[in-house]
A protein has these predicted regions:
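Active-site-adjacent structural elements that line small-molecule/cofactor binding pockets in enzymes
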Residues: 1-193
């Protein structure tokens, strides 16, 4: 194929260093001839992070720092960074991506404030929703308000929303509803931890 885009939804700076993310995504961008999008987020599921022996206490702040680092790694020569979580001595990161100024970036969103934040940062919005159309409409409106005042974290604005949802197929409506309710309960319990 020559047109399908490739993406990560989402990579988590709490368990991957931003320079590794930048270099790996640039490599994939080269291999795919400029068809990569980067999804980044904090992870909403503590069970995922417990496998790495980390918690989500500072995950949002780490994402914020990574969002400062990754576009710089892609677009600048030598740079340095001194943050609360990541300290990078002066260096140039290679390879550089094919896409200019850099691959589009998406933010993993699960709450209204992250939809707004994605827009304000000029990032695409990646979300999963078990909500109805009215709630999704409100979340998209919130994103659009953010895009309206965007100060891009990188050097471009990705004005897109991608929302996936669960679908369960089967022959018995009652069993499907019970299974769907159990799955939704599980997802909600993970976000609440």
């Amino acid at each position: 194929t020559s047109r399908i885009r490739l993406g990560i939804a989402v990579t988590v700076p709490r368990v991957q260093h931003p320079l590794h993310i930048a270099a790996r995504m640039a490599t994939l961008d080269i291999w795919s001839k400029g068809r990569v999008d980067l999804g980044i987020g904090r992870s909403g599921y503590p069970y995922q992070m417990s496998a790495f022996g980390v918690d989500l206490a500072n995950a949002t702040e780490m994402v914020d720092e990574a969002l400062e680092i990754i576009p710089r790694a892609w677009t600048e020569g030598e740079f340095s960074y001194n943050g609360k979580f990541f300290n990078i001595p002066a260096r140039e990161v290679h390879p550089k991506p094919v896409q200019t100024p850099h691959p589009p970036m998406w933010l993993g969103c699960s709450r209204e404030e992250t939809f707004r934040k994605a827009g304000e940062l000029g990032m695409g919005c990646l979300a999963m929703s078990a909500s109805g159309p009215d709630r999704v409409t409100q979340l998209i409106k919130t994103y659009r308000e953010g895009i309206g005042v965007a100060n891009p974290v990188g050097k471009l604005i990705k004005d897109r929303v991608s929302i996936s949802t669960l679908a369960i197929c089967g022959e018995n409506r009652k069993n499907i509803q019970e299974r769907g309710a159990a799955i939704l309960d599980w997802y909600r319990s993970q976000q609440a931890l």
